[in-house]
């Protein structure tokens, strides 16, 4: 059992028949009354984030999850195919389970697939940042150097994000997979 006083960021718990990952928490001990723990929890099945306040000292059941490194191979209609990098077994995941993470998947990308009880697929964990090729961007106008000027760019996965004016079609850029924001040019090309 996990005591709320011993919460750690990244831990997984069972709460209200759901599997949650602790995103952040704060122990509060008011002058009067009992101590409590404010927490922000991500539902690993749905991806939604909730705020919940637990009384201090309450015990919760840990959720035992497995993370397996897999490589994205290809998509076929509504299915996305991943391969275990150790055993070479292939795994199909439905499009609706991947939600907003679809926009970052490209052939060969290494991800972690998170399983509950070794059989239920909860979600996939993407790298924090990935390199994607710009397939279309309006050309930048020479002399248009206003600070913080952005334009839309379409990436190889179909994702459209805001990029600085100096980014052109064909360049590789680094994108934050949590926020979907442009980080920098990819100088490794």
From Swiss-Prot:
Q: Which residues form a coiled coil?
A: none
Q: Name one Pfam family in it.
A: EFP
InterPro entries under this entry?
Answer: Elong-fact-P_C, NA-bd_OB-fold, Rib_uL2_dom2, Transl_elong_fac_P/YeiP, Transl_elong_KOW-like, Transl_elong_P/YeiP_cen, Transl_elong_P/YeiP_CS, Transl_elongation_fac_P
List, in alphabetical order, the GO biological process terms annotated in this UniProt record: peptide biosynthetic process
Write out the pathway annotation from the protein's UniProt entry: Protein biosynthesis; polypeptide chain elongation
Q: Which GO MF term does the entry hold, naming one?
A: translation elongation factor activity
Key word Methyltransferase present: no
List keywords of the entry alphabetically.
Cytoplasm, Elongation factor, Protein biosynthesis
Asked if the record carries the keyword ATP-binding, the reply is: no
Question: In the UniProt record, which is one GO cellular component term?
Answer: cytoplasm
Q: Please name the SMART domains in this protein's record.
A: EFP (SM01185), Elong-fact-P_C (SM00841)
Localization annotation: Cytoplasm
The principal localisation class reads cytoplasm
Function of this protein?
Answer: Involved in peptide bond synthesis. Stimulates efficient translation and peptide-bond synthesis on native or reconstituted 70S ribosomes in vitro. Probably functions indirectly by altering the affinity of the ribosome for aminoacyl-tRNA, thus increasing their reactivity as acceptors for peptidyl transferase.
Family note: Belongs to the elongation factor P family.
Tell me what this protein is called. Elongation factor P
> What is the organism field in this record?
Phytoplasma australiense
Lineage runs: Bacteria, Bacillati, Mycoplasmatota, Mollicutes, Acholeplasmatales
């Amino acid at each position: 059992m996990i005591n709320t006083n011993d919460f750690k960021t990244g831990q997984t718990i069972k709460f209200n028949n759901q599997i949650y990952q602790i995103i952040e928490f704060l122990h509060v001990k008011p002058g009067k009354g009992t101590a409590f723990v404010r927490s922000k929890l991500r539902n690993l099945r749905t991806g939604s984030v909730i705020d919940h306040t637990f009384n201090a000292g309450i015990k919760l059941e840990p959720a035992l999850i497995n993370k397996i490194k897999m490589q994205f191979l290809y998509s076929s209609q509504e299915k996305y195919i991943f391969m275990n990098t150790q055993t070479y077994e292939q795994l199909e995941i439905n499009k609706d389970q991947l939600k907003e993470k679809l926009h970052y998947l490209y052939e060969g990308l290494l991800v972690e697939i998170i399983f509950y009880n070794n059989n239920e697929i909860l979600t996939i964990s993407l790298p924090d940042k990935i390199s994607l090729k710009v397939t279309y961007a309006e050309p930048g106008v020479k002399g248009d150097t206003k600070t913080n000027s952005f334009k839309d760019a379409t990436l190889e996965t179909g994702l459209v994000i805001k990029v600085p004016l100096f980014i052109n079609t064909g360049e590789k850029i680094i994108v934050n997979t949590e926020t979907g924001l442009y980080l920098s040019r990819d100088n490794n090309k």
